[in-house]
Every structure is written in structure tokens, then in C-alpha cells.
Amino acid sequence: MVIVQMCFQNRSFAKNLILSFSCFLFTNSFNKGSVSMKRIRQGCCDFYRRLVRLLFGFVALWLFVSSLVFTSYLPYNEISWICSDYTVLLCLLFAVLCLALLQYRKIPFLQKGQQGRPLRIARWGMILCAGALAIWWVGFAGLLPLTDAKWTRESALGLLQGYSYWFENGSYMSIYPHQSGLALYQYLLLSVFGQDNVICFQYINCFAYMVILWAMGEFSYLFGMKDRGCLAVTILGILFYPLMFYVTFVYGTLLGLALSMTGLLLAIRFCEKGGWHRAVFSALALSLAVMIKPNYEIFVVGVLLYLVYSGLMKQNKGVLLPIFLLLVGLMAATRLPIKIMEQLSGCTLNNGYPTSTWLVMGLTDCEETSPGWWSNYANDTYAQSGKNAVIQNQIALEDLKAILSGYLRNPFSFVRFLVLKNATQWCEPLFHALWLNNVMMLCNETPMPQWAQEFLSTSNQYYLAQGLSVLQSLIYGGLVLWAWVPSPETRKDSEDLLAVILLGGFLFHCFWEAKGQYTMPYYVLVFPLAKLGYERLKLHSADSIRESCNPLSGKVRWLMPLLALLAALLMAYAMREPLKETLEMYKEIM
């Protein structure tokens, strides 16, 4: 009980405890003379693999059913409207697509599709065209940063101009010291490109956008897809055009995702082919991603689990190198920027708002905001405590205890809360992107052309979201196929790396502050898995389906997508009146 309490109160203690146990198990598993250790090693690997795929399967079902039933819209006031979707049509579309793919092997000319260099050239051409469009949008829009993006920039700019107001006690950086990495990055950019230069950050985002599109295809290659499959995944990334609109967001979202995906690719390559340089650059890329945006720690945890799993499966002590480098890099990424900022500003940065305040916000069903989204709770309790983090933590822990007690007394209210909260952050097809551009446009001193204003308007976002909700449902449907439908070919261990990262992101944001811009990286990351789900479905023949259905577990796995469609239809029917009423109200306020 004491150990559990210490883990809750001290995250570093919990991390060290887990890592110590993992290292003990990991180092002892290479004792080739011990049969018992081999059994333990194999048992741990099997348990981990099955647990990840089972949990991911249920998360995929949750997301798929939610996307079929709900579409969340985000107007200017940033309060989500959870409305009905075209559930019947989406279910029919998914069913028809799956049936068509099962007939794929019976159509000979589809098997003779072109592969090789022309498709690779086409893929690179599409990436460059998408990047050129992003560069044009940055130059055309001329959008300036707001809120956190603005305040981190102002903090860096202040240091260059010789004042440290933003770092003093009670100011922005003392409250949010985890933004030190982003502020340091801004400081370096402003030092090199000039203090009035905002567009350099946005152009770097354009390059990061192209890296993300490239990385999607590279994951597809690693998972066994051929050139057509890789091109299809890249096209999916381009069709998800909200990703491109993130280039104007002067924040660590795009660059952190590009670095993280590059780090994942290098880690997978290291486990397959070795090479110390891959370990070094993987750790470097992931550490920089965490420095710029701490949320990418979940990616690092996923890579660490993958490295331990790969090392145990292959009895490869070489993975100790990237594990060590990642741990060192993680410590440096979370602590070094704070120390540098303290040195530059001459101020001491505290720990900021306690973790408990974010958990209270993430678990509060507040009528004034969306469920689990940002509220003024942290600011209010900070003022109430006299800017004392210890007292604020005590207040937040009491409130957290009351919230959890209420959910324990009424578990249905907690389930309802999670359904609505996750609908706002996982079933908003635009993932905050156009909302960010619209708000920045409305706050701009220079007005944009009328057509651009209409394109970014709340009313037009409604129609764009309806179109993208189809793509979103198909993506989540592909994840269901990947997780549940038996595969006619051996799955690669590296596929589970993406699965465990999405799983971690989903669970984390069930309890943490919700926002579409936070969940977008996980959504983009699993595009290759979604395509792989459809890709493997079309490899099935009548014989392979009968063979996979022989054990009872095989029948259950084939039934899961059908049960998901049935659950979506029943939910949509049960909630048709309130969802329809909400949709009509939203149309009126537009």
C-alpha cells in the first residue's frame, strides 16, 4: 500500500520502480542455461503481445462505434457539440467495402497492378505537392500565434530583449515550466532568424508535415505492404487535410510528431538490422520531440516497451544501448531546458500546477465547457492557494477524491462521461485544425480574402467535418479489422508498437485534459495499421476463412466487426432524439 501511494504521488518513483523490475527481468532472461528463465521470458512476451492486442482491440471497437454514432463539432467558443452521424449509411459503406475486399482475389486484373519505381515517384511527387501547398498556405494566411504558442514566443522574445517578466513567480513560465523546451526552441529560432520572424517556425512545420507523410509510407513498407499500399497510406495522409492546416500552429505538435515517427522508424530498423547509429539517432529524435512537446513521452514509453519485448524475444542484449540512450535522453529533455531557461532568466522555475489539478479538469463533467476539457479550475485553485503549489495540490486531491467517490457511487455516470469526452476528442473529424486557423484569422490585424474567411468559418467547418467523418469511420474500421480479423500472414512485432502508443494515448486522455489537437498525433500514427487491416482482409479466401473459424476464438474474432456495426445501430436508435435535437440546435447557432 505504501509503494502504491508513493507511485501515485511521485511519478519518477513509479518510473524507476518499473524500470528496475524490467532491467532485472531483462538481464536475467539471457541466462541460456536456465530453462525456467526461458519459460518466464517467453511467457512475459506472449502475455505482453496478447494483452496489447486485446486492449487495443477493445479501444478500436470503442472508437469505431463512437465514430459511427457521433460527430463532434467545434464552434468558435470551443464548446463541443456532440451530434448524430449518418450511422446507417456509414455501416452500409463499411460492410460493402469489406465484402468487396473479400472478392478481391477473384478478380484477376486487380492482381496485376503496377509496382516499383513509377509508384515510388508518384508517392514522392504527392508529398512534394502537399508540402508546396502547405508552404503556400503559410505565406498566404500570415497567421500569428495565440495563447500558449504566443506566450512561449513572448517568453523567448523577452529574454532576447533583456527582461524576464514571463519567468517570475506567478507568471506563465513559472506556472507551465514544461513549456521550457518549446520556449528554448523559440529562443533559438528568434536568435537566428530575427525577433519579428514568426514564419520561420511555420515553414519548419511545412517540412515536418512532409516528413510525417513520408513516415506513413515507410511504416507501410516495414509492415510488409508493397508500393501500392504505401502510396495508398500516403494518399490517406494527404486526404486528412486538417494535418496540413497545423503548419500555421506555432507549437510543437507537427515537429514533435515528425521527430517521434522518425525515431520510431529508426528504433524498428535497429531491432531488425542493428547499427549503433540508428540507436543514437532514434534516441535523439525522440528526445527532441519530448523537449518540444512533453506529450510525446507516451511515444518514448511505447518504444521502450518495444525494445524490451524485442530484446527478450530475440535474446538480443544490443537493445540495451537504445534503452540506455532513450532514458538519458528523456531525462535531459525534461530537465535540461528548464535549467537553461533558469540560467537565461535568472529566475527559479517551480514544478508548476500539480498533476492532480490536470486530473480534476480531465475528470470533471462541467456544463460550461466540454467534458474533461480545459476549465479555469487550475487558475482558480492557484489563486485560492496563494500561489502555493503544495496547498493547491491538497485542494485538488480533495476535489479529485470527491469526483472519484461520485463515480464509484454511480458507475454509469462515469461511463457516460467517458463516452461523451472521447467523442469530443476522437470523433471531431477536423481535430481542432481549422478551428485554430479560424481563431487566428479572426484575431489577425490584416483581414484575409472573403473566400478564405468563408472556408474557415464555423458554418463551412460543419460541412467539411461531415465529409471527413466518412474517412474517420473507415480509419477506425480498419483498426477493428487489424485487431480482430485473423490474419492470413504472420503479424510483425513492430505493428504492436503503433498499437501500444495509440492505446497509451487513449487511456492517458481518458483522465487528462481533452482536446482534439492532443489526440490528432495518435490518429495519424495508426493510418498504416488501418490500411493493413483492409489489406489483410482482401488476402482471405473461402478456405482461409473456414480454417480461421475452426477454433471458437476464430469465430468470435470474425464476429467482432459485425457486433460493432450492430452496437452502433442500436446506440444510434436509442439516442436518435437527443442527438437529432442537438444537431438542429447547432445548425441554428451556425
Where are the regions a protein language model picked out?
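Membrane-proximal stem/loop segments at transmembrane-domain junctions that anchor or position
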Residues: 341-445
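Short acidic/glycine- and proline-prone juxtamembrane loop motifs at membrane-interface regions
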Residues: 242-256
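Membrane-interface anchor segments at the N-terminal boundary of transmembrane helices
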Residues: 78-92, 199-200, 421-502
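Membrane-interface transmembrane helices that cradle and orient dolichyl/undecaprenyl
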Residues: 223-224, 261-279, 311
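Extracytoplasmic catalytic/substrate-binding loops of multi-pass membrane glycan-assembly enzymes
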Residues: 141-157, 161-196, 349-351, 392-396, ...
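Start-transfer (signal-anchor) and selected internal transmembrane alpha helices
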Residues: 17-136, 320-328, 553-564
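Transmembrane-helix motifs of polytopic, lipid-linked glycan transferases
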Residues: 203-224, 262, 478-485
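Transmembrane-helix signature of polytopic, membrane-embedded enzymes
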Residues: 216-239, 491-500
